[in-house]
Amino acid sequence: MSEKHPGPLVVEGKLTDAERMKLESNYLRGTIAEDLNDGLTGGFKGDNFLLIRFHGMYQQDDRDIRAERAEQKLEPRHAMLLRCRLPGGVITTKQWQAIDKFAGENTIYGSIRLTNRQTFQFHGILKKNVKPVHQMLHSVGLDALATANDMNRNVLCTSNPYESQLHAEAYEWAKKISEHLLPRTRAYAEIWLDQEKVATTDEEPILGQTYLPRKFKTTVVIPPQNDIDLHANDMNFVAIAENGKLVGFNLLVGGGLSIEHGNKKTYARTASEFGYLPLEHTLAVAEAVVTTQRDWGNRTDRKNAKTKYTLERVGVETFKAEVERRAGIKFEPIRPYEFTGRGDRIGWVKGIDDNWHLTLFIENGRILDYPGRPLKTGLLEIAKIHKGDFRITANQNLIIAGVPESEKAKIEKIAKESGLMNAVTPQRENSMACVSFPTCPLAMAEAERFLPSFIDNIDNLMAKHGVSDEHIVMRVTGCPNGCGRAMLAEVGLVGKAPGRYNLHLGGNRMGTRIPRMYKENITEPEILASLDELIGRWAKEREAGEGFGDFTVRAGIIRPVLDPARDLWD
């Protein structure tokens, strides 16, 4: 064994309270149904506060008015975030019309938020509208099962590959993996869809009675696009094609970005290559990875419970051998693959079937009618006439997919009139933020509300140094949990306190290297001053085609993170 830190396969010790909660929940039922009828509070109480996450919801409140309400002796304005399960981000126009109506009529904020996990969220659902939202989703063939908490979350799939045929095949696998790893409990159907309690005993053959130790994220990726940021995910199937046809996958396991400020036992980690598998073994291997993590993941410390930590504790080879044993296969050597970028191709792209795909840039993924830019109304109008489907991308954008030549002009006219095709700089197209304030309870600094004006300033710096036609992959995340995927950016800002961020440099354009902290706890003017100097140097000193992140490493501005489990904090 050449492992650096082989440790115990199972961590002994006192289990976390989350483990007690799951065990006592009667397969995720808890007392959610009773709590729904409690009109004294706008929120869910006790264990239910966490159990609703397994049903795709987070309880939040509006932090902009929290102090004011406390002064008035009122409880926080509780409202739920709901995240839909949408493998591969594909949504029909009929489904879109239904979610548009619900967002407008039944949420506080009236918006649809596209996320970088290729689905949509509603923010601001009051308790009385919680059951109706699940029933609305069900009526159009959608659900929110397992999009949060200790399960396999929404499965991602490259949205707009160069080979349309490959997308169809890869997308089918994303759906199959998602379905295969879903919880089997009937709690969701009983509570939200009023389905009868059946006398049979619940069983969870894959996830187990206490589900997974921590969240688990899966992707299907079609090189050379890495739009789904595979290294942020626990389990990744990299599509290998021969003559444009999918033949199998390379498996990479153990990526993840979440850290805790100052806690050196936490680290972001890129995924490890396990090997190649033919298509027919895909579901067996997916199940084997999940059950190995189920059995070996750390249930005594939630900050050390993700797959990345299990791999480092037991060793990559040990984990891989166990997956092979459980799946009954031997991995073949990794097949060659490479990534060239991860941005979306904004605008019209022709597919191989003579249909067109229109990728619309949606800043921060927030779909709402703004003054002079009625984005939400425009998309609704397109949904009413478009015969194909919509695809949400992992960059929080939206693709109008499968447009015949004869419909192009009509759809483009609506898109332009609604501000959906306004020209933006390459820099803005390659920047991203998580939601953060006012709804996220974990937020330490602004992200979504900060990004637009911050990018205005970056655009000015790019123009000043003569590189306006270039871009730097730039991301802002409001806290170190890392939903904005700043820990795979060339320039990553991680929220530390209101108005203050840690500045990370040295990632790359392809998303295969973790950036290192360059400056800690600094303000926007300090960030801009640093970037002004560094962008100026990059513009003058870079080699042909050299991205900003690679330049900062080559020029010795920042040391590259080579082995994140051991050198991220050095």
From Swiss-Prot:
GO CC annotations on file: sulfite reductase complex (NADPH)
Pathway: Sulfur metabolism; hydrogen sulfide biosynthesis; hydrogen sulfide from sulfite (NADPH route): step 1/1
Cofactor note: Binds 1 siroheme per subunit. Binds 1 [4Fe-4S] cluster per subunit.
Essential cofactor(s): siroheme; [4Fe-4S] cluster
Stored Pfam families: NIR_SIR, NIR_SIR_ferr
Keywords on record: 4Fe-4S, Amino-acid biosynthesis, Cysteine biosynthesis, Heme, Iron, Iron-sulfur, Metal-binding, NADP, Oxidoreductase
GO BP terms: cysteine biosynthetic process; hydrogen sulfide biosynthetic process; sulfate assimilation
Coiled-coil intervals, chain numbering: none
Binding site for [4Fe-4S] cluster: 434, 440, 479, 483
Subunit structure: Alpha(8)-beta(8). The alpha component is a flavoprotein, the beta component is a hemoprotein.
Name of protein: Sulfite reductase [NADPH] hemoprotein beta-component
Gene designation per UniProt: cysI
